[in-house]
């Protein structure tokens, strides 16, 4: 019995540990969100555009999340000409397909407001005159990171994710969106 125990202990202790501290999952990269009433959707099976360009949806396959302990939603945006503050939302449509989106329940992951002066207006001379003296410069972009670890049970399999900005400008915004999963550990 002791020899069996020692053999099992030896086999288990010689197995390899795999520790991956994080995994970043890019959803949208340099995605344009703008208003264009005449927009003809050039939808693919993966990305769909709705609301005259103000909503984009993408079907993604999320990684297995059983071994992750934390998840974050990350959004980075900059203006490509829209001069106003706008509300926005990053959301998930679990267990949905494009044919039943109207009936699908959305799950908001991150709500945000686009800040004035980010990106497009950094080097505009007229805007610099309007900038408050206590702000040394406009930022190049803005990033939000939100802990969504409590949603790990639904962050799996094939889902639709969406991004909405309430813009009425045909210049709009450029957005990067992703997930970051932390603390992955397995013993092989």
Name each model feature, range by range.
Residues 16-188:
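Extracellular/secretory-pathway and virion-surface proteins
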């Amino acid at each position: 019995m002791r020899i069996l125990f020692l053999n099992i202990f030896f086999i288990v202790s010689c197995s390899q540990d795999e520790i991956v501290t994080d995994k970043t999952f890019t959803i949208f990269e340099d995605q344009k969100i703008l208003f264009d009433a005449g927009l003809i959707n050039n939808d693919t099976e993966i990305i769909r555009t709705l609301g005259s360009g103000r909503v984009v949806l993408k079907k993604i396959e999320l990684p297995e999340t059983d071994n992750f302990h934390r998840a974050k939603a990350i959004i980075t945006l900059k203006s490509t000409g829209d001069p106003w503050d706008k509300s926005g939302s990053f959301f998930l449509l679990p267990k949905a397909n494009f044919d039943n989106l109207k009936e699908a329940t959305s799950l908001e992951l991150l709500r945000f407001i686009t800040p004035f002066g980010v990106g497009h207006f950094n080097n505009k001379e007229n805007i610099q005159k309007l900038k408050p003296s206590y702000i040394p410069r406009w930022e190049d972009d803005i990033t939000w990171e939100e802990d969504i670890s409590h949603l790990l049970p639904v962050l799996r399999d094939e889902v639709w994710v969406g991004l909405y900005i309430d813009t009425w400008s045909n210049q709009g915004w450029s957005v990067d969106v992703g997930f970051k999963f932390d603390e992955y550990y397995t013993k092989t």
